[in-house]
A protein has these predicted regions:
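Low-complexity, flexible helical/coil segments
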Residues: 23-32, 89-95, 130-138, 154-162
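Hydrophobic residues in alpha-helical segments
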Residues: 46, 144-145
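A conserved mid-domain beta-alpha-beta active-site/ligand-binding segment of alpha/beta enzyme cores
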Residues: 145-225
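Extended non-globular C-terminal regions
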Residues: 205-257
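Catalytic cores of nucleophile-dependent amide-cleaving enzymes
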Residues: 71-135, 139
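Amphipathic alpha-helical scaffolding segments
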Residues: 6, 139-141
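A domain-level signal for caspase-like cysteine endopeptidase catalytic cores
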Residues: 1-61, 66-68, 72-75, 92, ...
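Charge-rich, solvent-exposed alpha-helical interaction surfaces
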Residues: 38, 153-156, 230
Length: 257
C-alpha cells in the first residue's frame, strides 16, 4: 500500500498554481530506523530554515504504532519524543497526517508530564481501504491548497469519506490527558490512596511528626490547580515560547476539571 505515493503527483501539480508554491516532497521510508532518522532531519531543517512541514506518514499501522516495508515496527510511544522535538522546532505548528489504520492512536501515549507532540493530528479511527484513504486525503489537500483553511480542508475530507477520519487539535489532546489523570488520580478515593502511600513513605529528609493520610489527600486536592498550570505551560511549550500563553487559552477555569 503506497497511498501517498499516488497522492504526491496530484498534490504537487495542484501546488504549482500558487505563488510561492508550497514544496511537496515524497520520500520512501522502508524501516523504523529510517523513519526516526527522517524525523530528526526534519527537526534540524525546521530549526535552521524555519520550515513548517505537514508530515504525511503512510504505512500499515494499529493501535500500538506503525509497521514498515521491512516489517520493522515503531511504537507510538517510541515515536513520541521524535515528534515532540519536531513540534518544538516548528514552534508548535506541526500538522501530522497519518495514512494507517488506527492512525489517531498516539493520543493514548500522552501523560501529564509530556510536551505536545504536534499542533494537529489527522488520522483514521478504523481499518480503512486504500481507496478510502486516497479519496479522503486528496479532498483534504485539494481544499487546503485552494482555501488555505485547515478547517475547510478537514470538513471536505470528512464529507468525502464519512465516519472514518478525525482531527485532533493539541487542545483536545491536553484535555484528553487531563481528564484521564483526574479520573485515575484525583478522585477522593484516589487521593486518599495516594495519601496513605505518602504517610507510609514521607518525603526524603522529613523527620517531623507523622502526618495523617487524610492531610496528604487534602494537600493533593489543594495542589490540583497548581499542577494543572504546570502541565499546561509544559504541554503548550509556554516556557519556550511565552507567546503561547495567549495562543492557547486553555485555563483551569474553562477546562473540565
Amino acid at each position: 500500500m503506497n497511498v501517498y505515493g499516488s497522492l504526491a503527483g496530484p498534490v504537487q501539480s495542484r501546488a504549482q498554481v500558487f505563488r510561492p508554491a508550497p514544496e511537496v516532497l515524497y520520500e520512501r521510508v522502508e524501516s523504523s530506523d529510517s523513519c526516526l532518522a527522517l524525523l530528526a532531519r526534519l527537526a534540524k531543517m525546521a530549526t535552521t530554515q524555519g520550515n513548517v512541514p505537514i508530515l504525511h506518514l503512510e504505512c500499515h499501522g494499529n493501535e500500538d504504532g506503525l509497521q514498515f516495508a521491512d516489517e520493522s515496527f515503531v511504537s507510538w510511544l517510541d515515536m513520541k519524543p521524535h515528534l515532540i522535538q519536531l513540534n518544538i522546532a516548528t514552534r508548535m505548528n506541526l500538522l501530522v497526517v497519518v495514512s494507517a489504520c488506527e492512525g489517531s492512536s498516539i493520543a493514548a501515549t500522552l501523560g501529564p508530564v509530556d510536551r505536545a507532540p504536534l499542533h494537529g493530528l489527522i488520522g483514521p479511527t478504523r481499518v480503512v481501504l486504500p481507496s478510502d484513504l486516497e479519496a479522503g486525503y486528496l479532498a483534504l489537500y485539494e481544499t487546503l491548497l485552494r482555501t488555505r483553511s485547515a478547517r475547510d480542508a478537514v470538513q471536505a475530507m470528512i464529507a468525502k469519506v464519512p465516519e472514518t477520519f478525525v482531527y485532533r487539535a493539541a487542545e483536545w489532546m491536553f484535555q484528553h490527558v487531563w481528564d484521564h489523570y483526574q479520573r485515575t488520580h484525583e478522585t477522593p478515593e484516589a487521593r486518599l490512596a495516594r495519601g496513605i502511600r505518602m504517610a507510609r513513605n514521607p518525603p526524603a529528609g522529613y523527620d517531623g511528626v507523622a502526618i495523617d493520610a487524610e492531610v496528604f489527600a487534602d494537600l493533593l486536592r489543594q495542589k490540583n490547580r497548581e499542577f494543572f498550570d504546570r502541565f499546561r505551560r509544559h504541554f503548550f511549550l509556554c516556557d519556550l515560547y511565552p507567546e503561547h500563553e495567549e495562543r492557547f487559552t486553555v485555563r483551569y477555569d474553562n477546562a473540565e476539571v
